[in-house]
Amino acid sequence: MKRAIFTFYNLSIDEEIVRLQSEVLKKLNKTADFLPLCSQTHGEEVIHPQGVEYGFNELFNKGYDTVMLLDVDCIPLNQYALEYTFDQAEKGKLIGNAQIGAHLQNPEHMYAAPSTFCLSRQMFEEFDKMTFMPDHRNADTCGFYTLEAEKRGKEVEFYMPTHFQRRPRNHVWDLGQGRGEYGIGTTYSNHLGVNMFYHLFETRLNIYNSLFYDKCDELLK
């Protein structure tokens, strides 16, 4: 299987975040091509969903069998996290970090979020190469894939938040239905209880970035 990991960011993102994510992946990634996608723009000139849409289509068109998307402030916590995620996607699952969109029509619908989101080309083609773009009513970025997988009876595996480091400025984000909360510096685990991915959130604010630096330093020792 030909595997790829990509992340999308622009020139407004803290360069140290970009560098450290790359270093962590260089250490832990053994089987996939890591292909960072940098838009030579600032702010909202090219928005994140557009980069995600471009990245998946481009990589599948180039012949990759399985593609993992990571937010630039999201990192695997061990080699197993990457291998397990790819393996499950290649078995026909949609897999990623759990999230909800409080502004959506169904605010408690859980979907595989673009912070960690892994998809096989087989599923991409089976779903008629559907869009990764949000409509902000029924789905956020990548959200239509979870909706379509559920509709077709495909298995969706979620990495659930187990703990986080800081409360967000307004309030903690709650998955609802007793499924847990997430916030700044969230660790996500699989159903076996293994810590898989760490996602900082709100990197663009440049408030919490030192937490990401510290987590990466921990992993790079």
Question: Would you name each region that the model predicts?
Answer:
Residues 1-65:
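N-terminal anchoring/stem segment of glycosyltransferases
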Residues 10-13, 40-42, 73-75, 100-102, ...:
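Short, solvent-exposed loop/turn segments at secondary-structure junctions
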Residues 35-36, 69, 94-97, 118, ...:
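A structural signal for short, well-ordered beta-strand segments and their strand-loop junctions
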Residues 45, 75-148:
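Conserved catalytic core of nucleotide-sugar-dependent glycosyltransferases
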Residues 49-53, 107-113, 171-180:
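Short, surface-exposed amphipathic charged segments that create phosphate/polyanion-binding patches used
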Residues 64, 90-94, 154:
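Short, high-confidence coil segments that cap the C-terminus of an alpha-helix
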Residues 64-75:
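Short beta-strand-to-loop acidic/aromatic patch adjacent to the donor-nucleotide binding site
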Residues 139-221:
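C-terminal catalytic/acceptor-binding lobe
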